[in-house]
Amino acid sequence: MLSNIIPLSIGAALGATARWLLNLAVPAAMSPATGNLFANWTGALLIGIFAETVNHPQWKLLLITGFLGSLTTLSGFSLETVTLLQSNRPASALSNIFLHTAGSLLLTWLGLKIGTAVK
């Protein structure tokens, strides 16, 4: 059990830190939602790559469940979308939904292709 908790915890700490740093790196002129979009897109690409290239169970826990689970954020995406709707900005909310969903699906597919190519 502990042999699973340690890599999971390390990955989660690194993923949460990466998301925080990514949000800090987003220029003030851009929407705060941009950091979460970049985090989700990065996570989508990486999960495709890792799904094809990482075989060891502890590495999967560290990279996929821990790191990517903390880097990506469905709850942040949900809050941003609901906030846009509550601010009477339905077009922005729909755009947010489309960018997160379509972009993540496309990047996961691309990541799987990259992972297969480097495997």
UniProtKB/Swiss-Prot annotation:
UniProt keyword annotation of Mitochondrion present: no
Molecular function terms from GO: fluoride channel activity; metal ion binding
Residues passing through the membrane, by range: 37-54, 61-83, 93-112
Stated name of the protein: Fluoride-specific ion channel FluC
Family indicated by similarity: Belongs to the fluoride channel Fluc/FEX (TC 1.A.43) family.
Localisation per UniProt entry: Cell inner membrane
Chief subcellular location: membrane
Organism: Neisseria meningitidis serogroup C (strain 053442)
Sequence positions that bind Na(+): G69, T72
